[in-house]
Amino acid sequence: VAYVKAAEREEQIVAAAITEFSEKGVPGTTLRAVAGRAGIPLGTLHYVFPSKDQLLRAVIMAVIREISDALRAELEVDKGLEHALRHGVGSFWNKLVTSRVGLQIMQYELMTYSLRSDSDGGLAQLQYERYSALVTEFFERAAQAAGERCAVGFDTLGRIALAQVDGLILQYIAKPDLDRARRDLNHALDMLVLYADPQSVERTKPLNAETA
């Protein structure tokens, strides 16, 4: 049997888990099924991920990296916050929502699974804290690169943007309609742009400065 590096084996298992969870659902998927999907013995999976919770955490982090890549794809950060909102969120929707419905269902199942199985809902908190931090950092970087300020805190903007997109995803999952979803997403982005009200930051002269 060919030797596989630990990092590669972990990626292999996580990719198999995402596929299995997306197709079969989080609650009903066993570690044995994930091992079978990855083409490895169950003992190997247990060695890499001793518990299902550890595997789910790795899955969440992998999905976050994928979302980050989708947000940043072909994005020109110095074009400002409005561009980041419209282009970044639009790119995410096209790449990870309309063509990956199973992935979106999996993410909601991860949250509800955690809330049902963990007394403190730690996995659900991790999931949304990381999502919110990712979106917040994305917006803040875009504004700073373009020399803009935002009318509200970037953390607030990130949470509200996440809430709006989550709601639209749930509607799309329940009743897929590409045209309606795209219209609603554009309306939501219009509202977010108005709420953020990005403006260029201009250097102002000191009050005691005199004109020559």
Description of each model-found segment:
Residues S51, Y113-D118:
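Short loop-to-helix capping motifs
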Residues T98, G102-I105, D118-Q144, T156:
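Amphipathic alpha-helical packing segments from all-alpha helical-bundle domains
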Residues E20, E66, L134, F138:
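Short alpha-helical functional segments enriched in proximate histidine and acidic residues
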Residues A58, R72-Q104, F154-A161:
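Hydrophobic alpha-helical connector segments
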Residues S119-Q125, A142-A212:
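Hydrophobic/aromatic-rich alpha-helical bundle segments in the mid-to-C-terminal region
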Residues R9-Q12, A16-Q54, A58:
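Helix-turn-helix
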Residues L42, Q107-M111:
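Conserved short hydrophobic patches within well-ordered secondary structure
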Residues M61-I67:
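Short, basic, alpha-helical segments at the C-terminal edge of helix-turn-helix-like DNA-binding modules
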